[in-house]
Amino acid sequence: MGYSRRRRRWRKPSKGSWGNRIIATFILALLAWAFIPGLGPDLAGLSTKGAPKLTLPDWGKSADQILSESVQTDLVKAVAALPEGKWESASPYQRSQFGIRWADVDRNGCDTRNDILKRDLSQVHTKPGTRDCVVVFGEFTEPYTGRYQQFRKGAQTSSKVQIDHVVALSNAWKTGASRWDAKAREQFANDPLNLLAVDGSSNQDKQDSDAASWLPSNKGFHCQYVALQTAVKQKWQLWVTKEEKRAMAAVAASCPAQPLPAG
């Protein structure tokens, strides 16, 4: 039994229908621009709903301006009290000027590197026969990246976790330490207040940078990092450059709950 299929006739859209579509598309685009955050003025305030707004100081201001307009916490006051000066360059920095690496300055039988590993890591395992001194394994949430990380002692693995001088030795040399005697410099290089177990690649990225040129990629650690630098500079009576102080002030001003570490 045969049948026939009726073909629909295609109708060319009228000029009016094309015009209506163009107008509708334009209106939708205009609404998106007006109300979606990042596209336009965000008239609905969607970008600020559900999250507190963080207001950072104006980086165009001086350190003194930033600090004077901030909540007067211990950290803010300590940054404000740091003396300003220029880098000293009478003689170049050398690591040997700060004594042997990781000396046992506290005479507890363990070198400073292993002392810091034991302090900063958890689930620590030590090598038998070393009086619980030589750390062979540990784990921690690494502060500079915020990631979980393990330490395993070995020729190819030990360097993945390094001990950082929060205030770099060369920075200290240029801001006052060049005037110290050898014993004071060795004490500074092994001061636990200025030492952190950190990700090796982050430490290499930092090198001898100050706060004006380097901060950890983990923004959640910025407050504690600057607080540590401030406490170290204060304890050892080191000065800061103008740029360094402004960077430290900008961070400190945004950290009303950050205490100043005890030395």
Where are these regions (language model features)?
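Hydrophobic membrane-insertion alpha-helices, especially the h-region
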Residues: 21-38
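N-terminal Lys/Arg-rich, disordered targeting/topogenic segments
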Residues: 1-18
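Secreted/periplasmic proteins that engage bacterial cell-wall peptidoglycan
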Residues: 89-162, 166-167
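Generic structural signal of hydrophobic/aromatic residues within well-ordered alpha-helices
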Residues: 75-79, 113-117, 248-251
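A general structural signal for short secondary-structure junctions and capping/turn motifs
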Residues: 83, 106-108, 141, 186-190
